[in-house]
Every structure is written in structure tokens, then in C-alpha cells.
Amino acid sequence: YEKRGVAVMVPQWNPAKCIQCNSCAFVCPHATIRPFALTEEEAAGAPAVTKFAEKPVVKTNYRFTMAVSPLDCMGCTLCVKACPVNAAADKKAAAAGTKADPADYAIMMKPQATQHDQQAAFDYCVAKVSEKPELINNTVKGSQFKQPLLEFSGSCAGCAETTYARLITQLFGERMYISNATGCSSIWGGSAPATPYTVNKETGKGPAWANSLFEDNAEHGLGTVSYTHLRAHETVLDL
């Protein structure tokens, strides 16, 4: 059972203050906080603990939620620090010589035990809520409506490497080959018996990953690309 629940503090989303920018999900190294756009039918089937923003996703009728997996979160606080609503609240309070009221934050850290009910909402959204192609694009906001194909890795809390790797899988993951160089990425990316790379739940496609020895990943990657091109050429000739 790999949902370790190791974080002392995990994020709590405040739908009343959220501006739906998705910056929190964009910086999350472990894909444990994710935006979802739900149809009325999907929203009706969601667990009672699911929180929704008052306003729908812009220019749609979709219900917006930011789902958090407290049992997968590492407690790095990057989501809290990246939130522009939080930054604005802190700036306003600093100008007044006070501290910001937590009620003015769109996301804040809370003890993990107080957030366990949100696991059901996260699990439901991951399993049952479909992607909405019209919302997906190569922006901070739009990219986060795409399912990440790297999730819940064993990288350290706040790891920038898995943040970038997760984002790349959202942009290109269904047609992505990874020739991994030995290092941190071979530990969080391929430790037996599990892998954090996954497949898109609707297409069944995901990254193809392999790890060569230390400095040989460039040659290994070249071989992978060369054979892929050769196989494609042979397939065309066979038609």
C-alpha cells in the first residue's frame, strides 16, 4: 500500500478565494493537488466532502474543484507559496503592518489528520471525472487540466526535477520516450517493484521509460529514436 501519508501538514483548498489559476497544481512535484472540471452529472456523483468553486470554469458550465490527496502529499508547501491570492493577501497585510488573515488565503497548510476526508474526493475525481479537451492548452492554467502521467513518486519534498518531469508528461506524455540517465531520476522514476509513470485513463497511452548505464543515456536514446524511425518506415512499406 503506497499511500504513505508521511506529511505532517497538507494543503487545504479554499474555494471562496480561489481564482482558478491552477498555479498550485503547476508547481506540485508529486501531482497531489489537481484541478478538475466536472459536468453536472459528474458533480452529482461526487462524494459529499467534495468542495466546488462558486463560479464555473470560465466560458463553460463545468463545476471547478481543486482536489488534494493528503495521503500522497509530501508537505513541501510549494502550492501555498505559488498562490497569487496568498501573495496578494500577504502584501496587503504587510502594508498595514499586520499578518494576513488565513481566511484570505486560497490555500493553506493544515494538519494531515484534519484533511483525510478529502482523499475520497481526490480518488473520485481521478477515477471518474473525464478530461475536458477544450480546456487543455500549453499555458499554466490549461496544462493542468491534462492528466499528469508522473504521479506520487519517491522524490524528496519540493523536488524541482519531478515538477518539470510531471509537466512534460502533461504536454507530451502519451507519445513520449524517456532514455533516463542514472541519478535521482532513476531512483524516483524506476525503483522496483513500482513506477510513478502511468498511462492516460482514457487512451491507455503513456511514457515509455528505460534506464541505461550512467553516462550512456545519450547513445541509448539515439538507438531508441533510430529504431522507432526504422520501424515506422517498415510499417509504411508493409501497407
Which residue ranges define each predicted feature?
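Ferredoxin-like iron-sulfur electron-transfer modules
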Residues: 1-20, 37-75, 107, 113-115, ...
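A glycine-rich phosphate-binding loop feature that marks nucleotide/adenosyl-phosphate handling sites
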Residues: 110-112, 181-189
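Iron-sulfur cluster-binding cysteine motifs and their immediate structural context
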Residues: 23-42, 69, 78-114, 135, ...
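Short acidic, glycine/serine/threonine-rich loops at helix termini
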Residues: 23, 38-40, 44-49, 78-79, ...
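N-terminal amphipathic, basic-rich helices that act as targeting or association modules
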Residues: 154-182
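Single conserved hydrophobic/aromatic residue that forms the stacking wall/gate
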Residues: 229, 236-239
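Metallocofactor- and cofactor-centric catalytic cores in central/energy metabolism, strongly enriched
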Residues: 158-159, 187, 193, 202-203, ...
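Acidic, Ser/Thr-rich peripheral helices and adjacent loops at domain boundaries
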Residues: 124-134, 197-208
